[in-house]
Amino acid sequence: MDAHAIEEGRRRWQARYDAARKRDADFTTLSGDPVEPVYGPRPGDTYEGFERIGWPGEYPFTRGLHPTGYRGRTWTIRQFAGFGNAEQTNERYKMILAAGGGGLSVAFDMPTLMGRDSDDPRSLGEVGHCGVAIDSAADMEVLFKDIPLGDVTTSMTISGPAVPVFCMYLVAAERQGVDPGVLNGTLQTDIFKEYIAQKEWLFQPEPHLRLIGDLMEYCAAGIPAYKPLSVSGYHIREAGSTAAQELAYTLADGFGYVELGLSRGLDVDVFAPGLSFFFDAHVDFFEEIAKFRAARRIWARWMRDVYGAKSEKAQWLRFHTQTAGVSLTAQQPYNNVVRTAVEALAAVLGGTNSLHTNALDETLALPSEQAAEIALRTQQVLMEETGVANVADPLGGSWYVEQLTDRIEADAEKIFEQIKERGLRAHPDGRHPIGPITSGILRGIEDGWFTGEIAESAFRYQQALEKGDKKVVGVNVHTGSVTGDLEILRVSHEVEREQVRVLAERKAARDETAVRGALDGMLAAARSGANMIEPMLEAVRAEATLGEICGVLRDEWGVYTEPAGF
């Protein structure tokens, strides 16, 4: 790009920066020297390929979505938490908010993730152990007791039963007297990643996609600030993928949901701003930064050039980041504080919109209160003490970072071509029921391609660890020292017994005729092809449980069986 074009871009950026609201903060170094909000080529310099880098807040958004970077608003500290029953988790949320957390992120237990009630025999021994147990709207009310849902943003990592759980959230807000139009947060409705990596689905893929489409329509019409579809790469990376695979599979899943919205006749400029993303921040510092920068650039280009998005907000890739649980070790667990800090810094330098930092004890148990507080303080030290929020994309222009960004983008584009090719094999006439990327994803799920590719990457990494080619301190190098015992959080089995007892009381107290009628109405909607959200809300209002709602739909739609593979 020639010097004139670069200066034109700088002037556009400056005008937008000047017009934007900034935080009241001291944007100087520790020595007192002022720092610019962004850095770029010197006036008069040329820079080949600068149009791919650009300025913050301008297409292709490599350097961030906003002209101010974090000077306008810092990332949201959103700590993932949930254990035991709703009352216990409510107390943890209040602790997080009181300690300076900016939002909430709900971790659900395994029965809830699988759409089962706490009294289901298959739930025995799992209730409240890896997250909070939620059986009905009454539990959701307790979960957010004394936390005004109109004032706090809430993320829910739930996937399979995402739609009925979100209906419980809406009913809890209703009972607080909160207008659904002001609710803000994200819902991890992404079902593709369940078939690809996490393996916690409920139905066949097509009914899941139908529910997601219903929710997209419903939220676009009445809950504009809420992001009804968070597309997750985190679970893909934690399953063993490479950074490029995480990026490509996640963005491809996002493109699939865009095709789903378009197939429903929705306006891309209306529904696409409701999509958000969830990425892993692994320990390879510069590769992670490059991954985040490439993600914004790829998404913007595809949304504009492939799917016809005209508004900037429809081209924006907003993402939450969680530090890499898979990078943490049970050996010498205090080292995990350092790993998490490095990963969090990579996420911030990559421009994350919100961040969860893992606790040092998560390889051993759910985080203790002390470990959770250290994880929270890690972000606060980065935000308040280091100056990393003063300059937008401070590594932009680095030869290393720019080449890494280009490389990971090119690797992702190759994977997109592989996915499209699989879609063409499924529909050689080019008549895709939803869209070409969606066809490729469904074909890759059905024949086990995604799972096989991730397994191969995980195997190669494990081989490198065992050979010593990849070093992990405390595991295969520097293994000698002992760092002391940790206080471990243990969820009592009494929690399960109490949850089952309360569930029985609530079932006994409800109007069974109303419950049966609401479930029948939901089933009728499932059979007719009508939008499922209002009938599901009626079932939730009648105190139908999660297991009952999901059970009706399982019986109607069937359960997916994964293909065997070695």
Where are the language model's segments positioned?
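Phosphate/diphosphate-binding loops
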Residues: M1, D135, T153, I158-P161, ...
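Catalytic alpha/beta active-site cores
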Residues: M1-H282, E287-E288, V306-A309, K313-H320, ...
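Flexible, glycine-rich loop/tail regions that form catalytic "lids" or insertion modules at the edges
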Residues: R11-T46, W55, Y59-F61, M110, ...
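Short acidic (Asp/Glu) and glycine-rich catalytic loops that position anionic groups and cofactors
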Residues: R73, D119-R122, G150, F192-Y195, ...
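Generic secondary-structure signature for well-ordered alpha-helical cores
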Residues: G101-G102, K145-L149, V171-D179, G213-A225, ...
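Short beta-alpha connecting loops at secondary-structure transitions
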Residues: G125-H129, E194-F203, I236-S241, F279-E287, ...
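Extended, hydrophobic alpha-helical segments in both membrane/secreted and soluble proteins
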Residues: V165, Y169, D253-G254, F277-M303, ...
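Flexible glycine/proline-rich, aromatic-decorated loop/lid segments
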Residues: D267-F271, A309-T323, Q331-N358, T363, ...
